């Protein structure tokens, strides 16, 4: 990746991407609030705690898509699917982490590893989880492409 390479903007939906003509579901974005209709208050509070932790890392775009809420810098690095009593989601990290915090790990490439999780209450957005969010934020900013695989 070249430093400062401009993002490509889709003329159909207005989303930005690191790669020109990036394949995506070109659809208008919805609202964050609509994703939480029918959810318990702890679900929204948990998402808000996650979002506050991510915003402490830097600017982030919140993309309320049809089936998920994605967090995006140069690329999407996290996604959330609110359920009635919990918040399902995943982070994209530049390395595999074997932790009971993650329900599933899928390796897409050596520097793009999906880690699925389920959060029940805002208190689970603790120092450990916040560190994972910060690491995922760097992936979203594509900082992981400036370093070797598996390094922070």
Give short role names for the model-derived ranges:
Residues 1-152:
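Charge-dense, helix-prone N-terminal extensions
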């Amino acid at each position: 990746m070249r430093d400062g390479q401009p993002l490509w903007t889709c003329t159909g939906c207005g989303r930005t991407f690191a790669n020109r003509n990036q394949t995506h579901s070109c659809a208008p974005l919805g609202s964050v609030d609509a994703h939480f209709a029918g959810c318990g208050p702890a679900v929204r509070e948990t998402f808000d705690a996650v979002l506050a932790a991510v915003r402490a890392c830097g600017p982030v775009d919140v993309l309320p898509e049809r089936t998920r809420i994605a967090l995006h810098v140069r690329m999407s690095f996290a996604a959330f699917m609110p359920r009635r009593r919990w918040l399902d989601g995943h982070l994209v990290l530049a390395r595999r982490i074997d932790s009971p915090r993650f329900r599933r790990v899928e390796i897409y490439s050596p520097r793009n590893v999906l880690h699925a999780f389920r959060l029940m209450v805002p208190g689970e957005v603790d120092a450990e989880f916040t560190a994972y969010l910060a690491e995922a934020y760097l992936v979203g900013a594509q900082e992981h492409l400036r370093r070797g695989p598996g390094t922070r």
